[in-house]
Swiss-Prot record:
GO terms for cellular component: cytosol. It is found in: Cytoplasm. GO terms for biological process: ribosomal small subunit assembly; translation. Required for maturation of 30S ribosomal subunits. The lineage of its organism: Bacteria, Pseudomonadati, Pseudomonadota, Gammaproteobacteria, Alteromonadales. It comes from Shewanella sediminis (strain HAW-EB3). The keyword Membrane does not apply. InterPro entries: Ribosome_maturation_RimP (IPR003728), RimP_C (IPR028998), RimP_C_sf (IPR036847), RimP_N (IPR028989), RimP_N_sf (IPR035956). Belongs to the RimP family. Its main location: cytoplasm. This is Ribosome maturation factor RimP. Signal peptide: none annotated.
Length: 151
């Protein structure tokens, strides 16, 4: 069964791409009676506030017609930023040797919160070095993953 995020991603991918952007990912967070839909867009040239505003109008129009969310919600459109969230295998693969922070659904090595270096990805399995130990983590066990920005 498709999750709400999967259905929303399928619904919003084409309108976002029609504006010349990539749908980096999305998060649907339920908070009581009110929810938040965060849509992350990216582009090789970078994302500017005008891009977010234009995408927000387009996405809002699609959501108004399709009406996939039955509760009240707030739509937020932004770039992934420097501490970008990672959603897909190819995104993790693009950041091999980079440091990430991940939250897991089920603990691995006794923890649900890990910080480590991406050392590889094979299929839907992520290799992560944490404190010198190599861990293999199923992508579907990752609740949230973010790059840790280098300054």
């Amino acid at each position: 069964m498709a999750t709400i995020e999967n259905r929303l991603e399928e619904m919003l991918k084409s309108p976002v791409e029609a504006l010349g952007h990539t749908l980096w990912g999305l998060e649907y967070v339920q908070a009581g009676k009110h929810s938040i839909l965060r849509v992350y867009i990216d582009n090789e040239k970078g994302i500017f506030i005008e891009d977010c505003a234009e995408t927000s109008r387009q996405v809002s129009a699609v959501l108004d017609v399709e009406d996939p969310i039955s509760t009240e919600y707030t739509l937020e459109v932004s770039s992934p930023g420097v501490d970008r969230p990672l959603f897909k295998a190819e995104q993790y693969a693009a950041y091999i040797d980079e440091t990430v922070k991940i939250q897991l659904t089920m603990p691995v090595a006794g923890s649900r919160n890990l910080k480590g270096t991406i050392t590889g990805i094979e299929g839907q399995m992520l290799s992560l070095t944490v404190d010198g130990n190599e861990l293999i983590i199923a992508l579907d066990n990752i609740r949230k993953g973010n790059l840790i920005a280098k300054f």
